[in-house]
Every structure is written in C-alpha cells, then in structure tokens.
C-alpha cells in the first residue's frame, strides 16, 4: 500500500476498574459542526494542561508515526527505518495483506482447514474487527470474529472447557476436497437488547435524561453444521473479535519485571482494602496466599528453542516469559505470540517451526470416512492423499495426514514442504513488530484536557494504566530467525492505557472464561476513519464509547463499576469531555 511514513521523534495502583474499550457513533462526538476544534498543528510536541510533551507520542520517539490520516494504522515505526529494516517491513506487509491460495504462487498453502485466507480478513485496515449480523466469511467484510465453543459449567455460564472436536479457534473453511469442520452459513448470530441492567441502574443518564442502548450477541450452532466424528453436544458459544495489531511490538518491549510489579501493586491495594484478592486478580496468574506470581502467569513451552536479541539462549521449557497477549493472556513473546502463531493456525500455512496442522482428531476421522471426500481423491491420482488408490488406502492416508500430531514434513504417507520459509517469517515479524502507533491529537483542547482529568479522578487509570517504560527490549526469537534484527524499542516511554492484566466486568453473555485483559486504548479514536467502524469490547457489542463504558457498570460486581458509575452520574458536558479524550489519545 502507498502511504507516507514519518520519522519523529508511575502509576500508583488504586481500585481496579476497567473503562471504555470503545469509539463513538453520532452521539459520542461532542464537537458541534458550528464550533470546530482548533487545529493542534501549533501545539504538537509541546506540554499542555494535564499532558506532558511526550504524550503527543504514545509510542515514544521510536514507535510513533506523525501520520493521523486514514492510512496511519499501516505505518512503520521510526525504529524500522532507523534500523535499516524498511524493505523487510514492506515484504512482511504482503504476508499480512495477501490472500493465501491452496497451491499457486508465493502465497500458497492455505488449508486443508482454515479460519481465514488472510490476516487482513480479521483485521480490516489493520484495526479491530467489525460487528456482524452473520458469521459469513467474505474478503473485505471485516468479520474478525473467532468463536469460543465450550461445554458450559452450568446453563448460561461463561466458563467451561473448550470442546475437543474442533480447534480452539474453530475453523469454518476448507480446501477441496475436504469439508470445513463447521459450516459458517449455519452459524446464527442474534443481537439482543438489554432491557434492565443487573446493577439496577436505569438506562438513561440521571443528569439530563439522555438514554442509551446496550446489545449483546446470542450465537447458536446446530449439530448438522459440524463435520466431525463425534459431533459435539451440550455446547455454548461466545464471540471474540480481533483487536488492532498496531503497537504490539511496543507492548512486547515492556520489561517482564515491570508487569510483575503491576500484579504485586494491585494485589497489595486489594489486600489493604480488605478485598478478596483472588476476585480481582486471576488466581491463574497471581497466588494471593503466597503473595507472588502463580506458575500459570508464565509461558515456557515454545515448541522450539530460541535466542534473545543480545545473543543469550532461550530454551523451550526453560525460559519463562510472562503472558501479556490475547484477551485470555495465553501468549508471551510477540515472536511466538498471537500474530506469529496466527499466520500459521488461522491459515494452516506451515513453516519450519510449525510442521504440524492446526486440526483435531475428530475432524480427521470425519474426513477419512466421508464418501464424497474419498471419491474426489480417488478421481485425482496426483493428490497427496491418493496412496494406492483404494478406499482403504485413501482413508488411512487422509486420517493420518490430517491428524494434529503428524509431522507434515516427515511421515510415511506424504512428505510436504514448508509453505512459508524462515526468511518470509522473518520479514513478517519485522512488519508485525514494526507497526507504529499514531500520535495523539487535540491535547491542546480544553475539553480533552478536562476529559483526562476526569478519567484519572474517576479511577479509570487503575486498569487503563497510562504509561510504561520499555527498558532494554531484549526480545526473544525462535532459532530459525535467531540473530536477525527486529525493530527494537529501547528506553521508550509509551502510553498504551492498559495495565496488561485481566479483570472482570460481569456482562451478560460475557467473554469465555470471564477474565479479560485490559485492552490498550491508544489509537482507538481513529478507528472509524481508518477502518469504517468503531465497534468495541471483546465481541463488538459496544457501538461507541458510551455503550462500552455503560457495560462496565452493567453489574455491581464489575471491577469497573464505581468508575463507570461516576461517568453515569456525570453531566453531559463531562461525559462528552471523557469521550473526546478517548478519541484523542
């Protein structure tokens, strides 16, 4: 894509309350057309009331782009150019944007089962997925939804183990001759309206009577949609939408010990306040009784040995990194994180360090027993699944080659070749780690300044921690790209507005597992301009900032209830000021 690139140049824990993963619609742009906001051109880089000069650059000198136009999410960070990685960045960008094919051209290898054919399908214009009324998968429709399909602990529960018949991120596409594990067109999404909040709050603001509406998704999948053996039963489904990919390299650069301090700081506050620490910090990550990090907070099974940027060794099973990525906090290093993993498991495009398929035994069995699948393979002697051409031979080969345990490059049935090379993966990671954060806007505006003041006073920053320092950024990489330079962000002050921990909001049909990492707020105010949508929260249920904030006080059990209650009780002028602040950072 063509775009301009620019070279530009602590927090005390209080009551944990998350706030406003959201952007606005017509109600949440408080700036009236006849009262235009003064341009910030003469103020950029200068301290303003309530803002330091550095806050104009949320990604620091090495991670911020001055571009605030519709292409800004696509920009490389200044670190990319300063470190001589521009060409690698542009090559890596192609692997994010291009549609993968089955067996043609440089971008081949999709399937045999997959979620999407390209990364861009889930991250429209590099941003957050868009709210959908159906699960249809089509290029450019912005459907960034993944499903969590699980056996609920109780009727209506958000908790329970993932089912084993389909992959953890369920696949709805397949390459011929196979059938998708789940047929996308049979998945139904219904948006329900909240009539009464569990907290008892009326759905209008008491200061002025302005009303608001809250919606949430109900998702159903009939048994006939599954092509697995066995077919799952007693299931529940929750949606999770992708978040934007910008600035993830900067989050990777936050020192591990600083995140550990954040856990300890919040735990100390809750204990001193006489609160149940294990209710406010996930026991999987924080051992309240021992007052220390729990074993589950660390990721150590990388599947491959690795190396640090300074040349040190990072062995799988030995090197332990704190989890910081995904809503569920399942990943640690970005180089083995959501993007590095997703380029494999979303498309099923193999590479030297990913020699196995993202699949399930139940799907392999169903495909090996499907007469239509066997007939198509039997009619094509060139198929890698053809074996000796007999039904029995094809059945055995299909089953074994589709198993998640089979090494695709070294087995007795067919030896495939890696579909993404180590060099291609390296370029992809230069791109992934090199994406910039757009600079802040309108920090000179009095409403924005008041919005930040209220944001801090109301306790929103307790979870949406404004800033971090990056330290030495001694990143980890898998051995297949060890020694190759990736964008590095040493000693930067960054402003993601996230504490990098999980909290609970107790929403209707909440996220699977109930706990959700605090989503960074930086750059989100540009979403509508960049992507055409501004849906927020984990499943895009919030259509603007106001709805996102009000979901934070849907229940009195919400960790953000008191913060959101302050917003609820505020005047429209103050509510609009907070929204304007969120749109500006």
Where are these predicted regions, by residue range?
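Enrichment for repetitive, rod-forming helical segments
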Residues: 10-11, 548
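N-terminal cofactor/phosphate-binding cores enriched in small/glycine residues
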Residues: 93
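Bacterial N-terminal signal peptides that target proteins for export
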Residues: 2-10
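Electron-transfer interface patches adjacent to heme c in soluble/periplasmic c-type cytochromes
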Residues: 30-90, 100-429, 433-446, 452-585
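Hydrophobic helical h-region of N-terminal Sec-dependent signal peptides
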Residues: 11-17
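C-terminal motif of bacterial Sec signal peptides marking the signal peptidase cleavage site
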Residues: 19-22
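Bacterial signal peptide processing site
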Residues: 24-27
